[in-house]
């Protein structure tokens, strides 16, 4: 919302214009809602490996999907670079403007979380917060919340929760971009430092495996009937690790950012879990 409104304010796009973005799905869903409100055309470049549920939701909201093969950021075939190229090719083709959202390096992303998410957390906890943890996709949430909360209390501990296969844990802990393993989670973890993540005020980092994340979300579904996606499992896993580090009497906040229904064909699919040799809940 903030990124699109900023583009409209700066006359980069207006009603009838084209929004283009490379996204693993969830930001795209948000953009699709915003595009409808402002009368914009939305083109989404998405890795074809993403869940069919997210892709169908995007289509239902009116987005045009351009599916590409999954490729690392270093490749010219990476979905983010593809979206930029398409935006450049379409530039000038629409009198109402063509705008590449660039969520990973558009720092309005970070500013939005300083102004909204951080303030909401501070208000909802009445300032009684000792730590915040989340994973990184664009880095906007972690950067914005870390800045916003530390403006209120510099002693609040900010931690990254990183899936296997991502390089950011190594970046925070050892100041080098290295990775090991892999993850089935979608839209989080990266091999580079984005313009948004550059701004993050991070004190610590934790790695969370798919096995840990899945066991957490399966237990939540069984015990509390809350159905979450893999990113939420990674976030909760990191929050548990920070809570164990800080000890009793501390309030830790994280983000439950993805509903499980968007991953029914994957993490709530018995055949998929078996094919990946991942934990299988007794109720599935």
Predicted regions and their residues:
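PLP-dependent amino-acid enzyme catalytic core
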Residues: 1-284
């Amino acid at each position: 919302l903030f990124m699109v409104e900023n583009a409209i304010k700066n006359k980069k796009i207006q009603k009838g214009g084209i929004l283009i973005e490379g996204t693993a799905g969830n930001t795209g869903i948000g953009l699709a809602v915003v595009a409808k409100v402002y009368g914009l055309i939305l083109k989404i470049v998405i890795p074809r490996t993403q869940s069919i549920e997210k892709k169908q939701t995007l289509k239902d909201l009116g987005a045009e999907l351009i599916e590409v093969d999954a490729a690392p950021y270093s490749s010219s075939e990476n979905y983010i670079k593809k979206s930029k190229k398409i935006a450049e090719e379409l530039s000038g083709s629409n009198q109402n403007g063509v705008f590449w959202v660039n969520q990973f390096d558009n720092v309005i992303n970070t500013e939005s979380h300083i102004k909204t998410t951080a303030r909401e957390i501070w208000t909802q906890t009445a300032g009684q917060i000792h730590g915040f943890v989340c994973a990184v996709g664009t880095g906007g949430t972690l950067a914005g919340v870390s800045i916003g909360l530390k403006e209120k209390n510099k002693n609040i501990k900010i931690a990254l929760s990183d899936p296997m296969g991502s390089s950011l844990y190594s970046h925070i802990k050892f100041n080098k971009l290295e990775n090991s393993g892999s993850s089935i989670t979608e839209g989080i973890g990266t091999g580079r430092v984005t313009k948004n993540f550059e701004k993050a005020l991070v004190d610590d980092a934790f790695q969370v495996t798919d096995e840990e994340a899945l066991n957490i979300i399966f237990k939540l579904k069984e015990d509390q009937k809350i159905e979450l996606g893999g990113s939420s499992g990674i976030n909760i896993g990191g929050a548990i690790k920070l809570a164990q580090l800080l000890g009793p009497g501390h309030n830790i906040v994280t983000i439950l950012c993805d509903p499980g229904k968007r991953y029914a064909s994957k993490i709530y699919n018995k055949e998929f879990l078996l094919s990946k040799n991942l934990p299988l809940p007794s109720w599935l």
